[in-house]
Amino acid sequence: VLSEGNKKAIKNLLQKIHSQTEVLGAEALARLFECHPQTKSYFPKFSGFSANDKRVKHHGALVLKALVDTNKHLDDLPHHLNKLAEKHGKGLLVDPHNFKLFSDCIAVTLAAHLQEFSPETHCAVDKFLEEVTYQLSSLYR
């Protein structure tokens, strides 16, 4: 459960990355592919897996924009993320463990780029991404 302090830290962070979703998203996704090459199997149409690849940039931006959009829905993540959970769980059949792997790559990318990524912010981001991961995995049960 996110505390009010966590929510404030998340909102501040998400506002700061709003204009950088393509760059940060592409790097996080490329990091996922490099560190966990088995995840490439979910992207058969991708011809490249670097942060400079057009499809990596596009998909990475989609993911980070979706996270930024949760800024308005921190008190109702289950409802807000339901369609994405259904798409990934029932349509794309993504192994839910991959959400945790990608969350870790997102956190590392944010830490590498944002001076504001204090220990307190790191804790809030971990809790937030853990909650997002839980909600995206919810329809697998």
Curated annotation (Swiss-Prot):
Originating organism: Torpedo marmorata (Marbled electric ray)
Any GO BP: hydrogen peroxide catabolic process
Start and end residues of each Globin domain: 1-141
Record's protein name: Hemoglobin subunit alpha-1
Tissue specificity field: Red blood cells.
Gene3D superfamilies, sorted: Globins
GO molecular function, one term: organic acid binding
SUPFAM superfamilies: Globin-like
Residue spans crossing the bilayer: none
Subunit structure, as described in the record: Heterotetramer of two alpha chains and two beta chains.
Superkingdom of source: Eukaryota
Binding positions for O2 per the UniProt entry: H59
Gene Ontology CC terms: blood microparticle; haptoglobin-hemoglobin complex; hemoglobin complex
